[in-house]
């Protein structure tokens, strides 16, 4: 369909609140499990994955007041990670995960 195209998965980011759920721990555990499973599966298919480690501490300044969307600073960090990942995938296409899995 699109020759030469590559598929990239952008990990699900954490949130300070989840719509339709009061159990933040259960939602975060599910998010982490999904990210791990997809990363592992997509690696086998030779697809790319971006992991956003900077968001795992869930610092409130990274999120808007609603606790769901990213703040200006959060968006800046997100876009910088996305750009860095794309550069890594272009220059070292054999590294399927950003940041590089060691």
Residue spans of the language-model regions?
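Charge-rich, low-complexity amphipathic helices
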Residues: 16, 29, 60, 97-101
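Short helix/strand-capping connector loops at secondary-structure junctions
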Residues: 55-65
């Amino acid at each position: 369909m699109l020759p030469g195209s590559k598929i990239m998965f952008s990990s699900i980011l954490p949130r300070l609140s989840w719509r339709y759920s009061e159990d933040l721990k259960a939602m975060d555990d599910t998010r982490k499990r999904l990210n791990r499973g997809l990363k592992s599966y997509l690696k086998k298919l030779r697809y790319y994955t971006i992991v956003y480690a900077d968001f795992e501490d869930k610092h409130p300044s990274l999120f808007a007041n609603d606790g769901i969307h990213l703040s200006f600073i959060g968006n800046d960090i997100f876009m910088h990670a996305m750009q860095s990942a794309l550069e890594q995938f272009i220059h070292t296409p054999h590294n399927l995960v950003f940041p590089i899995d060691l």
